[in-house]
Amino acid sequence: MTRPLLPLSRRLSLRLVLCVCVLIAAGCQLTSDRSQAGAGDGKTRDEVLVWLTTSDQSRAMATMPPAVFAAQPPLPIHIHIDEGKRYQRMLGFGAAITDASAWLIQHRMSPGQRDALLRELFGREGAGIGFDFTRLTIGASDFSRSHYSLDDVPAGQSDPKLDRFSIDPNRGDVIPVTRAAIGINPQLKVMASPWSAPGWMKTTNSLIKGTLKPVYYDAFARYLVKYVDAYAGAGIPIFALTLQNEPAFEPDDYPGMRLGAQARAAITGRHLGPMLAGRKQKVEIFDWDHNWDKPHEPLAVLHDPVAAPYVSAVAWHCYGGEVSAQSQVHAAFPDKDAYLTECSGGDWEPVRSGGLTLQARSLIIDTTRHWARGVLFWNLALDENRGPHAGGCATCRGVVTIDSKTGAVTRTDDYYALAHASRFVRRGAWRVASSEGRDGVDNVAFVNADDGSRVLVVTNSATDERRFSVATGARVFAYTLPARSLATFVWHPEGDSGTGR
């Protein structure tokens, strides 16, 4: 549902009324006030700040009365946090600025609407949810308005010197939207993935299906480097590349190609890796960029002695297999990072009856508990018809929905699942040990490196409320979470009364 901010005078009045309500009735609940999120000034060290979203969105990032640390025994559902046991450091959360997303934001919103949305998504002030990680497509994906690469030539021709390479197809939407996001959040990390090499490099001579001809391994690596250089020149530094989106899949009606482990290892180890090594602007290479069901694929590349030194991480998608594959690969190669680089919500999920907690549990809690340093959902924005797209998924959902006629914004379950982490867990935060989930209550805990704040994200997937206790050190608090809801808890260690931001 669309949630435009109230006029300032009404928000101030509402806030005053709610504060009085809390003073005169301890049980009074605050309604949603997204602009309040993160406020912690004046809170005591015994208070735990709470934000809540329910599946029906009757409360959406609602600021709730704080929980309080108090002497009490643990409840049957108990979350024990061990801050001394630390795992990966977080890079960030976000979603992909696909061609479709950028086109809608740039061409179906007024300048005021566009600025407000981008500040909300990428900023940390006011209602900002602080996305600091995004993904771009190198050429077209299914969520483009047409099929293209960045070096298309007439049928029967080739361009091994890449003389016709151009990022002009992106100058009208992807580049200005991404630059605007970076302007709001200069710390934004941008990764990029091709859906297909240019058709003339492939066995099908088409963007559709096929694989890369070995004779063009070097040209394809240079194609990716030219993309990095061209985007840097456009004011968009690329943090990381993958060689191919979903390299074990050949879609029938949109760009794609197979690229097996042997080919990826050869391109990475003998071409792309050496080309990127030693550059002033470091660009990382992530392998795989596909589902959890084939961990042997990235393992094969990481076992290659020539390719492995150039691979910094494994990129994962959620559409097959189990998230434990991330831990399987991490156990074999603990020096290689893990990222969830794509997962889409869609019409196949139970709307307002579990989709929220499914997304939060599977993609925020489970992935980070299995070593993910960053989490990316798929389309940042789609329209009311789940587009625009040229082939592929017709039922995928964006993090936000933009009305193609009015530019109005609807925030989806994916938005709130991400926001409950992205707003509070900042770059460099440590994921710390916490109890496994039980009885429908799942969690993940973090310690922010910048201000020492503690962040706990909890879902209740059950159809009734759940009461649980949380212990951190010698301190304990208890909370009752409504059915099918998601909450974030923020506090500071004893002796520190800083804010929750």
Model-flagged regions — what are they?
Residues 2-17:
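Bacterial N-terminal signal peptides that target proteins for export
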Residues 42-64, 69-81, 190-192, 222-230, ...:
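Substrate-binding and catalytic surfaces of secreted/luminal carbohydrate-active proteins
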Residues 97, 138, 245-246, 317-318, ...:
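Residues that line or immediately flank small-molecule/substrate-binding pockets and catalytic motifs
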Residues 59-238, 270:
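N-terminal catalytic cores of secreted or lumenal carbohydrate-active enzymes
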Residues 13-27:
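Bacterial N-terminal signal peptides
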